[in-house]
C-alpha cells in the first residue's frame, strides 16, 4: 500500500499554482486573464493556512498593477524571499523593466505565464507566444511546458 500512487485530475493553472505555492515564500499577484486562476488558487490556499514545503504559509500581496507586482517581486527577492508571480500577455509586457533588473542582479524567481496573443486590431484571446517572445532579451531563462504534466513537473 505504501507504493500506491495518487493521481489528480487538474488543468495547467492548478498545476502551476500548486508547484508555485509549494516552492514559494511570497507571491505578488495582479489578476489578468487567463492567469488569474493561478493567483486565485494561491490566494485561497494562503487564506486557508495551507503550508508550503518549508512549513510556512505563503505571503500573498495583491498589487495595483502588473508593474507593481513585478516591482514587489523584485523587492521581495532582494530581501531574500523565494518569490513568484503569475501573468499573461499585456501584463507580462508591463513587467519587462523589472525583469531586466531581476535578471541583471541574478535573483532567482519564476514568472508563471499563461501565453496569450497580444491585443491588436483583432483582439485575439487565443494562445500565442508573442508575449513571451517579447521578453527573450531580458536575460531570463525560459522554460515552456507542452502539457499539464510538464507544468507540474
Per-region residue spans from a language model:
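Structural signature of the thiamine diphosphate
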Residues: 145-153
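Short aromatic/hydrophobic contact patches that present stacked aromatics
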Residues: 142
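Thiamine diphosphate
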Residues: 1-134, 139
Amino acid at each position: 500500500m505504501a507504493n500506491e500512487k495518487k493521481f489528480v485530475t487538474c488543468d495547467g493553472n492548478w498545476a502551476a499554482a500548486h508547484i508555485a505555492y509549494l516552492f514559494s515564500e511570497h507571491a505578488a499577484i495582479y489578476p489578468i486573464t487567463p492567469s488569474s486562476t493561478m493567483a486565485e488558487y494561491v490566494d485561497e490556499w494562503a487564506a486557508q493556512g495551507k503550508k508550503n514545503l518549508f512549513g510556512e504559509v505563503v505571503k500573498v500581496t495583491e498589487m495595483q498593477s502588473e508593474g507593481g507586482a513585478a516591482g514587489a517581486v523584485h523587492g521581495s527577492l532582494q530581501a531574500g524571499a523565494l518569490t513568484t508571480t503569475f501573468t499573461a500577455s499585456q501584463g507580462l509586457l508591463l513587467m519587462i523593466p523589472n525583469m531586466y533588473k531581476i535578471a541583471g542582479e541574478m535573483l532567482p524567481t519564476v514568472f508563471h505565464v499563461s501565453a496569450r496573443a497580444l491585443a491588436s486590431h483583432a483582439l485575439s484571446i487565443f494562445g500565442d507566444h508573442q508575449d513571451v517572445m517579447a521578453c527573450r532579451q531580458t536575460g531570463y531563462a525560459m522554460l515552456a511546458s507542452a502539457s499539464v504534466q510538464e507544468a507540474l513537473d
